[in-house]
């Protein structure tokens, strides 16, 4: 049976995604975004707990005691100060696995450990076409790039006097836009878009006074981009990751579909769960794709490697240009939400 929900509800998902995309949260620097989500939990009287590893756990009582885990991650790619150069620029080490050439020319903010923030720009070491012969051809990597600070600094001491030191986190401007045609384009849709979908699911259940078939334990993980996000899970029976779907080459997924991942780099997802998701997508008349993601792993992968006795599956809205300037469409978000809702109610 097709789920009927007003289109304005799905537009609200995009707006909430934009809201949380504005809160910097590279892996390892997620306290502020978790505090923001905790405040939402308090306002809506959701049962929650912040775990020692920084993850946020939200519990929703179901019609029985079988426990389904849902997970999505709020951490993003970013960088960290690795050295201060003699000319007052910064060397950096990436956090996660970005397409580093896309960092070239991007605005960023350095967050010191003592409450100060300083803006800057990622640049190649040959940034000026009128000066550097290799401006177009120089490879973009950690050794050939730097950060130019928006302060009057001329040497290492000037930078230290600003309070910047090695180990400070660097967040990129996500540049989020929602277009009249229904696209949302931004860095870090992977995976703040899924966080927005899950929080709107919580809102929907509360508003409709609807209980899921099984008890839900929802984990908002904070270290997925570095591989350990859901390596610890509370006691659950099965686990569904809501993360970005892959788009490109021979894959069937696109920005308007919900992707159901049958296998990724870490191996196949649970056969029965994946089959059930496909059946539900058909029953709900959703626009969906089943794909094998060639260079990918998820919080389900981390949970299994962490020794959790679970079965797991993966779905998500198709996201183009992943780990770069990402984009998806309202239709993909709608299909993902409807599949997630059908999954927890059936």
Regions inferred by a protein language model and the residue ranges of each:
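N-terminal hydrophobic/helix-forming segments and targeting peptides
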Residues: 1-346
